[in-house]
């Protein structure tokens, strides 16, 4: 799990199902096997390979960030969430996911699926887009983030929110944390 491969997959998976991303990811990696290849590519080449995934700002930001990584870091990913989050199209959660999965850095994540999971698990009132609610969710995400097996935890918590704790019709009987879920208890 290199930072580059994790980064590209995380960006592709934003607002897009895994089943859709798989083929695109492989074609992208075949054309741009590393950050240097992506940075050297023409923007039109990048957008062409993105055709069908939608949300083209993701592809443009990916390309810009690749160039920034090569120009400022020699093609290496920075070591801190704060530095990674300065790259175009990467926020705190995506930066955390990249570093946790590729380098084992202890960094909480809070994508849409994790927000939903934590909101339900702790019956956090309010809309997650409001700053006080988001701050509370970050606190919870920080508390749950373990000290070991960061890649496994990060993938598991995202998958739990994406597959069981879904927006519509969550599968509570199959959920491993259902016994502690305050939303289910209500």
Regions found by a protein language model. Give the residues of each.
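Catalytic cores of DNA base-excision repair glycosylases
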Residues: 1-185
């Amino acid at each position: 799990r290199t930072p580059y491969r994790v980064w590209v997959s995380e960006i592709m998976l934003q607002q897009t199902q895994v089943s859709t991303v798989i083929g695109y990811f492989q074609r992208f990696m075949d054309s741009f096997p590393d950050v240097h290849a992506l940075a050297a590519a023409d923007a039109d080449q990048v957008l062409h390979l993105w055709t069908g995934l939608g949300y083209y700002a993701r592809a443009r930001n990916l390309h810009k960030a690749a160039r920034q990584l090569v120009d400022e870091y020699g093609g290496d990913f920075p070591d801190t969430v704060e530095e990674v989050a300065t790259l175009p199209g990467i926020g705190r959660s995506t930066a955390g996911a990249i570093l946790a999965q590729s380098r084992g850095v202890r960094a909480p994540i809070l994508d849409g699926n994790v927000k939903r999971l934590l909101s339900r698990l702790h019956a956090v009132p309010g809309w997650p887009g409001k700053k006080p609610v988001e701050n509370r969710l970050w606190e919870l995400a920080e508390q749950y983030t373990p000290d070991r097996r960061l890649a496994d935890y990060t993938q598991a918590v995202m998958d739990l929110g994406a597959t069981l704790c879904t927006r519509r019709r969550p599968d509570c009987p199959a959920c491993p944390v259902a016994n502690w879920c305050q939303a289910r208890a209500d």
